[in-house]
Amino acid sequence: MVIIVKPAENIRLDVLIATHSEEAGLLFKTVNGCRHMAYPDKSKVHIYLCDDNDRPEIAKLAHDMGIGYFGLSDNKLAKAGNLNHALSKTDSPLVVTFDADMIPRSNFLMETIPYFSLPEMILDHGEWKK
């Protein structure tokens, strides 16, 4: 089944990229992949680097790439703490999370977001059913 994002369904969403100690070069690739995801209204896609080491060079990378940055210097709760910190600062109805070494396909949003607007649909053993 292929479902396409309709204009009325292109709601705001936040893309959170969790990082702990990954190098800027790796993060550049991940952010670049996220920036190139297709979506009908790209102004509704907000990408953030969530850095639980609060590194100045990663904040600069985020700035240079035109995305948001959340630094967290006193994280005691690992990735969950990092993402919860970011979630406390965002308000989009949908959130996508990626690890620092995940590069999404350009069609990721176009193929996943429509499922959130299907009424009474459930995922049952890998199949969408009413």
Which residues make up each language-model segment?
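Internal catalytic domains of large membrane-associated glycosyltransferases
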Residues: 1-130
